[in-house]
Regions:
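Conserved nucleotide-sensing/catalytic segment adjacent to the nucleotide-binding pocket
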Residues: 27-84, 89
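A glycine- and Lys/Arg-enriched "phosphate-lid" helix/loop adjacent to the NTP-binding pocket
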Residues: 89-142
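Conserved lysine of the Walker
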Residues: 13
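Hydrophobic positions on the alpha1 helix immediately C-terminal to the Walker A/P-loop
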Residues: 16
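Active-site signature of alpha/beta-hydrolase-fold catalytic machinery across serine-
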Residues: 19
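The conserved Walker
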Residues: 9
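NTP-dependent small-molecule kinase module
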Residues: 23, 133-183
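Hydrophobic anchor at the beta1->P-loop junction of P-loop NTPases
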Residues: 5
Length: 183
């Protein structure tokens, strides 16, 4: 099973992808972990071909769960996906989550992706690209985009699941884990 998890920043993509990959016993690939290089270098902007190559390499596996919304590398992994999960979380819950996540990361000063040295900094909160502002600014656009892509429960003939809360997430994880056992 190869599953792509999408949703706006703070919707629970990575949390869902980690839990699903653990339940399925397959690797979890976080596209942010591929994109964000040491010193917050944005690989997708600075070397889009290399970003695409790395995502395509990760997508070669027989089974995985990937999370992220990078449209510039969609062809590298969406074409191999057997299912899609759209984390359709309400705007106010997204904002609460992303503010709490940013705060806890800034206080803990933990490295976000191993080997990058990248850490959340309070002084970055005012920048346009910061996840708090990004989540607010892109929530509506992302929701419309994912509704158009997955609104009928499929994407190019493959299942697309819409998850709006934790209970739905738990049920979907259990369902997909059961389905994976029968394959």
């Amino acid at each position: 099973m190869r599953v792509v998890v999408v949703g706006t920043s703070g919707s629970g993509k990575t949390t869902m992808a980690k839990a699903l990959s653990q339940a399925l016993g397959v690797p979890h690939v976080e596209l942010d972990g591929i994109n964000w290089q040491p010193g917050w270098r944005d690989l997708g902007t600075h070397d889009p071909d290399e970003f695409f190559r790395r995502v395509a390499e990760a997508a070669k596996g027989e089974a995985w769960v990937m999370d992220g919304n990078y449209t510039k590398v969609r062809e590298a992994h969406w074409t191999r996906a057997t299912a899609f999960v759209w984390m359709d979380t309400g705007r106010w819950l997204v904002m609460r989550r992303v503010i709490w996540r940013s705060f806890s990361r800034a206080v803990s000063k933990r490295e976000l992706w191993p080997g990058t040295g990248n850490r959340e900094l309070f002084r970055k909160w005012v920048e346009k690209e910061h996840p708090i502002r990004w989540a607010w600014d892109t929530w509506e656009m992302n929701r419309a985009r994912f509704m158009a892509a997955f609104g009928d429960g499929t994407f190019e003939g493959r299942p697309a699941y819409r998850v709006g809360n934790r209970a739905q997430a738990r049920r979907l994880i259990a369902r997909l884990a059961t389905e994976a056992l029968s394959i």
